UniProtKB/Swiss-Prot annotation:
The keyword Oxidoreductase applies. Its main location: endoplasmic reticulum. InterPro entries: Cyt_P450 (IPR001128), Cyt_P450_CS (IPR017972), Cyt_P450_E_grp-I (IPR002401), Cyt_P450_E_grp-I_CYP2D-like (IPR008069), Cyt_P450_sf (IPR036396), Cytochrome_P450_fam2 (IPR050182). GO terms for molecular function: heme binding; iron ion binding; oxidoreductase activity, acting on paired donors, with incorporation or reduction of molecular oxygen, reduced flavin or flavoprotein as one donor, and incorporation of one atom of oxygen. GO terms for cellular component: cytoplasm; endoplasmic reticulum membrane; intracellular membrane-bounded organelle. Belongs to the cytochrome P450 family. It is a peripheral membrane protein. It holds the Pfam family p450. This is Cytochrome P450 2D14. Its cofactor is heme. Cytochromes P450 are a group of heme-thiolate monooxygenases. In liver microsomes, this enzyme is involved in an NADPH-dependent electron transport pathway. It oxidizes a variety of structurally unrelated compounds, including steroids, fatty acids, and xenobiotics. Heme binds at residue 446. It comes from the Eukaryota.
Length: 500
């Protein structure tokens, strides 16, 4: 008789079920705390996984917000989650309680990519000394290689010239701008990280872009959420390769690019770029087991810069061009301002912003309307906190619904319409808005914000300086509704770029 006969399987199944239910009850204890945020009743073990559409959670969150208010709770298998909506709740958590909400959920789901102690990159790193060390290094290195100086501005304007040349090659024919925008922005990141740019037909940049896009799609599916909540499942042989094939291939390509830089590096010379600067820090930290400067972390820091700094900016630019062809009156006003301040010969400069309030307002309104990262990146509480009168225990994952701020009907005059006047006063002067937080807020706000602002202004003004954009003749009007896949991208569209 086998060990697992019919007589023993029944009691074992009952025992396993009882164990899982007890474990489930243990993980639900936080929901019983006084003043814990309300939320839908979770199912045993699964929590609320079946009640939220993770292909696009925004509609689910909007329904739950209407039902439970600006602060509501979910259970993701056994992970407690609180969703924050509206400027007051988001600001209270990320700004006023910044130190207590600056942590990230443990990135166990990314261990297959090389994440581990002392190797967490910057974006997903736990809040602590390693994160501070890497954020400080990244900001210092960006400054040393030109952020806030003319050198980086020149890189961007030169790349903008290459982009304009590629647009001109289309000879006024209909085309999709997304691919060229991706390549231009990725070249700015490549200049910072590797000191080089790729030709737009280079197979490596094409592969890099394809894997980045596919890797982002892998972030939002039900299987991914299950292994995130129960990371032990990733120990199943071959599962990670099946769930995250693009992310693993992306990291392999990053390894190849770093290896090329190591082969050409001369340690006796000043660092050429961020990778060299990081390798110098690795040498300095040799023998220090507490340092986050190591080869494993280098690949993650570089991957962070590419994955976060490339697609977000190029997607925003794609939205900008879409909105220009849908709102030709706005396009004409931007071009008029460009002609008056810059002309049609001189390259745009960051110093021009002070004299171009309408163009700056348009760029801001593109970011607000496009709302490309509607849910931000998850935070985690490092101690018990209170937000809007609700008790949120230590170890709770926080999701900040940035879309609820960028399109808050109590803040914006026309929240669901493209309306550059949101950022202009009665005299036509640019006005900052407190509810404008596309880069998030607090200690974990996007460290690439200054670079992104530079790229958006210089690429956008360069393109509108040289071209007029329109919907191709005979094609239907493109949609203003985006497609959600972690980022919100425009639905596929084409345009015509006619030289001015």
């Amino acid at each position: 008789m086998g060990l697992l006969s019919g007589d023993t399987l029944g009691p074992l199944a009952v025992a396993l079920l009882i164990f899982l239910l007890l474990l489930d009850l243990m993980h639900r204890r936080s929901r019983w705390a006084p003043r814990y945020p309300p939320g839908p009743t979770p199912l045993p073990v699964l929590g609320n996984l079946l009640q939220v559409d993770f292909e696009d959670p925004r509609p689910s969150f909007n329904q739950l917000r209407r039902r439970f208010g600006n602060v509501f709770s979910l259970q993701q298998v056994w992970t407690p989650v609180v969703v924050l909506n509206g400027l007051a709740a988001v600001r209270e958590a990320l700004v006023y309680r910044s130190q207590d909400t600056a942590d990230r959920p443990p990135p166990a789901v990314y261990e297959h990519l090389g994440y581990g102690p002392r190797a967490e990159g910057v974006i997903l790193a736990r809040y602590g000394d390693a994160w501070r060390e890497q954020r400080r290094f990244s900001l210092t290195t960006l400054r040393n290689f030109g952020l806030g100086k003319k050198s980086l501005e020149q890189w961007v304007t030169e790349e903008a010239s290459c982009l304009c040349a590629a647009f001109a090659d289309q000879a006024g024919r209909p085309f999709s701008p997304m691919d060229l925008l991706n390549k231009a922005v990725s070249n700015v990141i490549a200049s910072l990280t590797f000191g080089c740019r790729f030709e737009y037909n280079d197979p490596r940049i094409i592969k890099l872009l394809d894997l980045t896009e596919d890797g982002l799609k892998e972030e939002f599916n039900l299987v991914r959420k299950v292994v995130e909540a129960v990371p032990v499942l990733l120990s199943i042989p071959g599962l990670a390769a099946r769930v995250f094939p693009a992310q693993k291939a992306f990291m392999a390509l990053i390894d190849e690019l770093i290896a090329e830089q190591k082969m050409t590096r001369d340690p006796t010379q000043p660092p050429r770029h961020l990778t060299d600067a990081f390798l110098d820090e690795v040498k300095e930290a040799k023998g220090n087991p507490e340092s986050s400067f190591n080869d494993e972390n280098l690949r993650l820091v570089v991957a962070d810069l590419f994955s976060a700094g490339m697609v977000t900016t190029s997607t925003t630019l794609a939205w900008a061009l879409l909105l220009m062809i849908l709102h030709p009156d706005v396009q004409r006003r931007v071009q008029q301002e460009i002609d008056e301040v810059i002309g049609q010969v001189r390259r745009p400069e960051m110093g021009d912003q002070a004299l171009m309030p309408f163009t700056v307002a348009v760029v801001h309104e593109v970011q607000r309307f496009a709302d490309i990262v509607p849910l931000g990146l998850p935070h985690m509480t490092s101690r018990d906190i209170e937000v809007q009168g609700f008790h949120i225990p230590k170890g709770t994952t926080l999701i900040t619904n940035l879309s609820s701020v960028l399109k808050d009907e109590t803040v914006w005059e026309k929240p669901f319409r493209f309306h550059p006047e949101h950022f202009l006063d009665a005299q036509g002067r640019f006005v900052k808005q407190e509810a404008f937080i596309p880069f998030s807020a607090g200690r974990r706000a996007c460290l690439g914000e200054p670079l992104a602002r530079m790229e958006l202004f210089l690429f956008f003004t360069s393109l509108l300086q040289h071209f007029s954009f329109s919907v191709p003749a005979g094609q239907p009007r493109p949609s203003e509704h985006g497609v959600f896949a972690f980022l919100v991208t425009p639905a596929p569209y084409q345009l015509c770029a006619v030289p001015r």
